[in-house]
Amino acid sequence: MKETNKWSVRDVITTVLLSAVLIVIQLVVNMVCMANDFVSMVLSVGITMFLCAPVYMLMVSRIGKRFVTLIYMTILGVIFILMGNWFLLPYYVLVGILCELILWKEGSCQKPKRLTAAWTAASLLYNGVNLLPIWFFWDTYYDFALASGMEQSYIDSYVRYYTSPGWLAFILLFTTLMGFLGCMVGSRLIRRHFKKAGVL
């Protein structure tokens, strides 16, 4: 699909709908993984980035315009505000801007390598959802966690994993790798299915 700068109503609707799909995937994975502390703390973000990668690549390729990623990240930040984590909105806006810089060159929205670079960076930085509370907003997060019904054992596990250098390094590497692998799957799906079906 040819990349242009002019947005249509259809582009806006498609961006919002696919952003909603991405957010639903993220929320569902998070809820399912909360059944086990290890899976929730260590693996869930990586699983999320892997599953979301093909949808993200489809969305950006389908729209073929700048600011798609920024819009998605902004919507994600608004969802976190509604969940009580106001500090994640400016953070995800910054993540969106970084991804837009990676995709800024004309034609990047149709280049798998550029899309992979953008989503891999987003995957690494998505860990801010767990790191920012510990580093800067612990009181806000702790009050939110208790108010939302989280058990103290869950909060203790969260602190243990995200303050251990070894576990933190593993989580960051795992999440980044899973985002990258998800893009490999997404590139294959786009090449073998979406383009042939006329979606792109």
Question: Model-predicted segments: where are they?
Answer:
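Short helix-perturbing small/polar motifs within transmembrane alpha-helices
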Residues: 24, 93-131, 183
